[in-house]
């Protein structure tokens, strides 16, 4: 490699990197791989990307840098051959409710332009097409009437308005007109015209009366101009003994007078007041009090606490109880009946009140007795009013617990106002276009029939829309709709959307750094993704991809393996070169799995489903097609299927949310389904995802697993601590007493530098040890509390071998492959895969009831094949305890080791939503319709 076609890294020491030197080719597809926690991300993101970004930032003026987040220089001696860097990772999905697939990919911006330039407006009331016509066009149209036709030119000054309208008649008289037509009847303006005040009327001024013959063109033009001036552009031509013609010089319905402003792109923007629905301000939904959250358990009676809303609990003698008793008397129900037995009218009045109807309230004897009549506001209505009126954030937060998102009643979730939604291209409005899947949208755009003028205007716009839709298709996202909210996308989907957007921008000479773009992608769509990565490379860019997927590794021009282990045992370059060389590398675990020397074994026998099943009936959330699904309990089940087939809708939206509401009493609203049976065999549901175990530097594996409490208890039992009277709280860095107060137990102090990045320096008082001197003097087996937290988990296992309480928790962490992390390592430095395994370890350490269902969504994210092997062992262990494990997964190694599979499909989006196959992996592999089965066959 010549010097200018490579990136040379010298002395990289960020995180666990061990002063490594590395040379990689530019304009190539480079894959970085290695065990979870080996240092791949530290090299790719925290070193190469961070430095590329920092150098670009430093080329800007100090004034501009003030407004940008400052970048720290990574711990590296030098990097040569670096380009401006763009990182496409998992984490930066927009949580803005206004962000959609259309806005993120910029397709929506081009759509707004297209609808503004070639859209056809319609009347929002009657739906008829509205045309904008000049005076000359109107005159030419009228001149087409047959010779000798009698007609009059009318100016519609009042259309369907109540009133006597004497002002309008007076103004017409003063302007010199002599006739009007009111409600279809002709009147002379010299006579007195009386109209009913409370009826709607339509009034037209007769501007001129004409007979069609040669030479009337100039008089007709003048009359039409006069009529247009009086009405803002509306003109009626009343043909005697014929039909009436309506014309408009602006975008207005001649029938209803509803006018639409000139079409502009801002009119179709739901982030702009000109286009957004006035009710929901363009979000498409609003927060409303949800009766199902006020009374979540219809099996309870009101006396036993069916009503959960604060202030409305049925405690004898409260005003709430008096209202409920009055309603019970009115509707003939008892407060000891289950709510499910109450009539709809009764429940409706409990929620939304009596609408002004008075009910008899009886005051209890202990409150003085007596009775009075009053109306009742209703619990839901009361909460809505209090929510709207209160200024207290606490009150709003409390009431929000009983609210859920509901479709906006004005725009029905379409986000735009009526005028914008009445403009069409090819017979569809902009939101109907956005509701189509990418494939349908592409077919629609390709099939548009335009006039030569429209085709000329829209040529460039359509080219951009087609290419961007094509890129979304090429990264396997053809099932998404442009209206889909960006916040509902999975990490892999949002990353591939940004990948498609980058291809659309056609930059060259850029360094792209990607974090596992294959996440959430079925094997079937992998080839599309690889072709997309190559396309980005062929534009003249360098791609560094952190990836564990075998297909992507084999497609790389260059591969870098970081290892050999994880954490303190990693941080070295094991191999750097072409893929063929990695297969022969004896030191590389990756190479051994790639070449087939190491394999994850297929289990010799699988667990059989018992007679305990979870039956989901009529699941219809998102794209699910009213399906029935049976999930066996007590075994390890995997839900598979292509991206967008409905796996997450079934597992996360319906099964998890229903069970967490029922078993854990959480306030969530599950997706749409008819019924679910079998939950009586379960006592709790646990979702184990890759979200951080804590969001502050103070949370760590020790605090999450609870082992820190045991360690603090142990230190407080030492003779030294007892002599000084120290309790367990003395050894906490979160509360005053034992911690160093100079840094408040953080061990580091932040110094703001304004134009330069903030600098974090070790605390001068405690030297980064977090505790004060007296606390650090207390030792157990020669180590103080800071030194214990600074040990790796494996060191801790040896150190605490004779303290079962601590040993067991640390041993489980070691068993899940986390022996290398420090006991007190800050949770903000842990990867998603590490956080997930800490959660699994915490579960394994608990005493099992055998009635828990564990739900995991793509747990292999960020995991090397060797880590996947450990993960499978943990899942099998959890299942051995009699628990149920339900996993959504694309990784074939996990799929082949499951006891039972539920394969969704056949396609994504509108082409999915059904169960294609279910049974053991062998049974699914034998199914000719299943895509998953076809790939499984090769492994079994």
Which ranges hold each PLM region?
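Conserved phosphate-binding elements of NTP-dependent enzyme cores
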Residues: 1-940
